[in-house]
């Protein structure tokens, strides 16, 4: 297994990278961490690695992009009340989807065969952020909305 998950945040990612001896790391926001340069997000290193890969492959950007599958992301949120026990809701969601692949390193991520949903509570306001990804924008939005409905029902 060459892919390791870690909680969001540069310090969390770099700590895990050092622990496992990773040669590259990053976050969903596009931040690239390349220890051969330094243990910090660096946009220029990301650009240099991309250009180096293009040169090595001898391809145009469009050709390289066409060689990868397309995924679409939807970002939503469920607004709750300050009295809501967000941790209890996330635990219930985890139980409801126990037959799917679940990762709870940073919230609750549910991996379905052809899509995923990641639920993260806010540390500053009573909300759950709902990130979803699928092969079409509609499918990403649909699975996000389905899980949001589950959360809203649990919060009643």
Predicted stretch roles:
Residues 7-11, 30:
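Short, acidic/turn-prone active-site loops that include or flank metal/cofactor-
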Residues 57-156:
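Catalytic-core signal marking the mid-to-C-terminal active-site face
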